[in-house]
Amino acid sequence: MFLHGTSRQNQHGHLEIGGVDALYLAEKYGTPLYVYDVALIRERAKSFKQAFISAGLKAQVAYASKAFSSVAMIQLAEEEGLSLDVVSGGELYTAVAAGFPAERIHFHGNNKSREELRMALEHRIGCIVVDNFYEIALLEDLCKETGHSIDVLLRITPGVEAHTHDYITTGQEDSKFGFDLHNGQTERAIEQVLQSEHIQLLGVHCHIGSQIFDTAGFVLAAEKIFKKLDEWRDSYSFVSKVLNLGGGFGIRYTEDDEPLHATEYVEKIIEAVKENASRYGFDIPEIWIEPGRSLVGDAGTTLYTVGSQKEVPGVRQYVAVDGGMNDNIRPALYQAKYEAAAANRIGEAHDKTVSIAGKCCESGDMLIWDIDLPEVKEGDLLAVFCTGAYGYSMANNYNRIPRPAVVFVENGEAHLVVKRETYEDIVKLDLPFKTGVKQ
């Protein structure tokens, strides 16, 4: 069993996170419960930033808020001096509600609506990452209408395949995102933006995938982009002030995962950018990166209460908990794997193989297959580790189950940052079906 960040076994034999006993958290806030180790988030943020500071380079480390967005999380990102990557009007609204500096917000997405782009312009955000020709035309029209101007990056697909799950590989040519780097699309986009009266082309962006454990993809992407930048300088007199190489830095979910440290990713990116800038005679552009999962993923733990059990003789022992695919859909969606422990008996031998089932009325609602735990019983507390990314943000009300609360823990204190949904919350937007209305 691998404990991340400040997680440890305390004197009572319980799991402790951020100096707070997991049993206390479950008793006070209920389960399922998302618990975030704030100290670990801070540590990761500082590691990414310090690597650029040590190199003496201009850079922005933008938190990819789709991993986990709440007012408190955005405020924590601001406190750590991060920029912010948003991908919807809702994420932008959350950032505004949190008081995040608009000039450090970058707006991504492949189908931004007119209303979302208008919102971005009205709040004077720092940059829009343009994804397609439709968006260029729409943005130009809105800028004329509102009298605003905007800096943009062009999202390109460099044709670099990250060694990761197909569903989250986004840098290949066959992708819903961005302009293809090799078929002339990017050149057409550059021409269109350079002709604009209101849109300023700041640079280019790419994202090659997620849960990446080496740096080869980032190096190759940088090489391909700089080769094109050299051509674009000659063709359009365009010099990229910003190079955004995205995120996708991996974390350790299980013992099979071997991610690099944050500084190792950044140092290799810096090396690749410096080398290619020198090769083609460019000044080093400002480098942007977008860590999301790598900032919050292993800082999150979900606490569940054990309920029923079912034994299939000679096959498997099922242990059911009070959550499931409604609070963590990743196992069903991506076949994601997690480690877990009995939080109230974490020091005991984990020597009985069981499978953890969710409570949803869905045969595929399985959180973990074949994991070793102590002999668990009803009422035991199960901790599933590394649920900080894409757990709460992908949570849903399937089976009309309320979404869990979220707690931040740090220095022995717990702070509720998202309230648990109630049944009243689930029906508050519903309207009755009225019969007998005359037409």
UniProtKB/Swiss-Prot annotation:
PROSITE patterns: ODR_DC_2_1, ODR_DC_2_2. The keyword Lyase applies. InterPro entries: Ala_racemase/Decarboxylase_C, DAP_deCOOHase_LysA, De-COase2_C, De-COase2_CS, De-COase2_N, De-COase2_pyr-phos_BS, Orn/DAP/Arg_de-COase, PLP-binding_barrel. Pathway: Amino-acid biosynthesis; L-lysine biosynthesis via DAP pathway; L-lysine from DL-2,6-diaminopimelate: step 1/1. One of its GO terms (biological process) is lysine biosynthetic process via diaminopimelate. The active site is at 361 (proton donor). It catalyses: meso-2,6-diaminopimelate + H(+) = L-lysine + CO2. Its EC number is 4.1.1.20. The modification N6-(pyridoxal phosphate)lysine is found at residue 66. The keyword Ribonucleoprotein does not apply. Pfam families: Orn_Arg_deC_N (PF02784), Orn_DAP_Arg_deC (PF00278). GO terms for molecular function: diaminopimelate decarboxylase activity; pyridoxal phosphate binding. Keywords: Amino-acid biosynthesis, Decarboxylase, Lyase, Lysine biosynthesis, Pyridoxal phosphate. Pyridoxal 5'-phosphate binds at residues 248, 290-293, 390. Substrate binds at residues 293, 330, 334, 362, 390. Its cofactor is pyridoxal 5'-phosphate. Specifically catalyzes the decarboxylation of meso-diaminopimelate (meso-DAP) to L-lysine. Homodimer. Belongs to the Orn/Lys/Arg decarboxylase class-II family. LysA subfamily. This is Diaminopimelate decarboxylase. The gene is lysA.
